């Protein structure tokens, strides 16, 4: 009796707890689904609660109707869609082999599927009929693990028969990755012309040079012996030659081809490609599908900068973050070594390095500008700025590049210059209302924004916007903190102001606060602060993430090799692969690099156009790097 009273008392617990804990909790088991499967398998093994018999090739297989209906659309429609099979104890299954049906039922009860060369085809046929995507994917993956040049056409036919787009894409990828070797086989010439045309048009075609594409196009129609012996007719060029991007071929190769061709459409095409090479200054304005790199590898890239330790070898090396390895690699030597804080812009996948600090025997403002072409690993010196600009910012708006303010180490500047790649010339546009240097800028929605910087000895928190349509500057709301030698990035409809330093504490300190400006609300806010100081950082945006590269930390009293990556969705910073050296003043951007580069050793010295002999001799006499306290920041 006493026990019953105690239990009754427990049942009277208040449903209004006196503390602030949640009234309800939801619990989720991570083991329940597997336990349920094990229980169903035990029922099957024991022959308990079967309620349907599948008749396949005249043989009977007992099963549980509810599990079949839950496993795929085919059985769900059969047993829960109002069909006559809902009431039948025996159901006839057509077009599926008994062995394949056993395989599929084993998967339904266990989530395991054993495939072999002897059963994969009939299992795939059954999975397609019964509409079980997971098994279809497993079969396709298994087939791909056995694909070679001898059986690839058979697998293509299987993919076409069952409309397996994923398998077709995997087969295409196999050929794209092994194109040079595969193009020398008989199976290559048995592919449909439309398929080969599509493959040769792809940016994912893995070749070391465009000449291999040209040869591959010929090998579809001619044998290797005929191609090597030049026993081919190009008066009426094969259609596949339309896919060859002749401007990507080396000029010497094009010239040899041009010289041996008679009057023909192909000769005209080659002549146009030669003109592309000869008009080097105008190449950015001559871009089209046939000048596009065969690559979809967008990489964070850095140029120049100052190292904390003497290094004449690394000072002129550009570096990129290899997305396959997750580490930094060197890929080209710069035409202008020992430069830092250069303005950087990317237009039509050409990199422009504008002005900046010439770090030879001290610091001086630079007016010279360079352009890098990753298609041919080639540098070209473009028209110089009309005046020297150090500690400037550079932005692309539309088809123009803008170099904004800065200083020449005699005066602070307000001048703004605009570069037109079509004419290789600079012209002045509307200047800023006041001088500024060590500011940062970026482009959003067709307008250019600059923030903060210095004027004389004062740190600023100003924000200005340039409208190229009206050639006017507008002043916007001040940012939340003064800073200079920082970076900016545009992401979605917001501007981010990152890093830098100020002397609000009475001495130079890092600014960790990251400010965010909404162009919609025209309001400033703060987001997750930087985990470390980044003055004079490189800034790049890739896949909606902001990369902050190296820089100077005044709190630590040193340059850094840190890389921090901002995730806007999570509002957090992650550590990225560190730079190989502590470096500040790195000019960073995002660039599409050749696919072959990611799989090979660093390139050697690039081709150089309009090399400056005086500048080269000047570099040859350079002593070690300046120490940390001898920097453009003062």
Curated annotation (Swiss-Prot):
Q: Does the keyword Cell division apply?
A: yes
Pathway recorded for this protein:
Protein modification; protein ubiquitination
Put simply, this protein is called Kelch-like protein 22
Query: Where in the sequence is Phosphothreonine found?
Result: 463, 475, 605
The species this protein was found in: Rattus norvegicus (Rat)
**Cellular compartment(s):** Cytoplasm, Cytosol; Cytoplasm, Cytoskeleton, Microtubule organizing center, Centrosome; Cytoplasm, Cytoskeleton, Spindle; Nucleus
Q: How does it assemble?
A: Component of the BCR(KLHL22) E3 ubiquitin ligase complex, at least composed of CUL3, KLHL22 and RBX1. Interacts with PLK1. Interacts with DEPDC5 (via DEP domain); the interaction depends on amino acid availability. Interacts with YWHAE; required for the nuclear localization of KLHL22 upon amino acid starvation.
Return the PROSITE patterns for the record: BTB
Please state the protein's primary subcellular location: cytoplasm
Q: What CDD domains does the record point to?
A: BACK_KLHL22
